[in-house]
Curated annotation (Swiss-Prot):
InterPro entries on file: GriE/MELC1_sf, MelC1, TAT_signal
One matching Pfam family: MelC1
GO terms classed as biological process: melanin biosynthetic process
Keyword tags: Copper, Signal
Gene Ontology MF terms: copper ion binding
Taxon lineage: Bacteria, Bacillati, Actinomycetota, Actinomycetes, Kitasatosporales
Function statement: Involved in the transfer of Cu(2+) ions to the apo form of o-aminophenol oxidase GriF in the grixazone biosynthetic pathway.
Gene, per the UniProt record: griE
Species in which this protein is naturally found: Streptomyces griseus subsp. griseus (strain JCM 4626 / CBS 651.72 / NBRC 13350 / KCC S-0626 / ISP 5235)
The protein's name: Copper chaperone GriE
Null allele phenotype: Cells lacking griE and griF show accumulation of the 3-amino-4-hydroxybenzaldehyde (3,4-AHBAL) intermediate.
Amino acid sequence: MPMNRREMVMATTGAALAAAAAVPLLSGGEGEGAAEAAAAPAKATGRGREHTERYLGRSIRVAAPADGGGVFIDGRPLHIMKFADDAYLSSMCHYEMAPTPLHAARRAVEELRGAALQPSTHGTHVTHL
């Protein structure tokens, strides 16, 4: 029996919704729980402790403010600016605010896509955390 247009649209929509609902189940459940787990060390970096981790094969270090602060990717400094509302902006992601320096560094690693972080050429800003 041939399907009319309405039945075809309903079947296609139903299949698309079912596929979208299955994505969290098939991807290991990386949703809000994974974001909360990733935020735990990030919250610690905002409280004066140094944090070091490997992210996507890169080394990220957020130095403690007592040690001069700063964010480093593979030992190279990442220019980070802190705003009054406790948001951070990096030179790699200039249009996206991050809640912590660690989140800004992770986003910069994603933007680098394996390339080496180049030093800042303008030299007019100092990284303050």
